[in-house]
């Protein structure tokens, strides 16, 4: 049950995301999980992936968590590149910011095989960035 991640999530630079149910904060049982046999800690973060509202109705799956994470990365890239805060931000730096801003449950140990370094929290990432810039 702990070796369900596959390519391309197994690469070092990829932001790998697992899925959880945002309604009750439970891990989605069909989500991929790590750690990897090559020693990499994956997933990096977890994002909502159960009953996500879309124009065609509610959808469940890792693709929903990936899409929400991609949207968060797009917001970060606007802040970094478009607004000239960090025009050289690369994939590893973006991943590090997402990890540092992740929301962690005090009853869990991080990183772990289901949640990675915690739940994706873009607000938390930007709050952390505002502290760094002061």
Model segments located where?
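Short, hydrophobic-biased amphipathic alpha-helical segments
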Residues: 118-125
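Extracellular S/T/G-rich loop segment that most often corresponds to the catalytic His/Ser-adjacent loop
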Residues: 1-78
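Hydrolase catalytic cores
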Residues: 48-113, 119
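Secreted peptidase-domain scaffold signal
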Residues: 125-134
């Amino acid at each position: 049950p702990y070796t369900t991640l596959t390519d391309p999530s197994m690469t070092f630079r990829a932001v790998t995301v697992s899925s959880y149910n945002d309604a009750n904060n439970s891990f989605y049982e069909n989500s991929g999980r790590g750690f990897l046999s090559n020693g990499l800690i994956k997933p990096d973060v977890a994002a909502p992936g159960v009953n996500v509202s879309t124009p065609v109705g509610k959808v469940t799956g890792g693709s929903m968590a990936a899409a929400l994470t991609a949207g968060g990365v797009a917001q970060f890239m606007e802040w970094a590149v478009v607004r000239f805060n960090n025009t050289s931000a690369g994939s590893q730096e973006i991943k590090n910011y997402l990890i540092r801003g992740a929301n962690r449950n005090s009853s869990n140990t991080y990183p772990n095989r289901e949640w990675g370094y915690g739940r994706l929290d873009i607000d938390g990432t930007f709050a952390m960035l505002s502290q760094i810039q002061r």
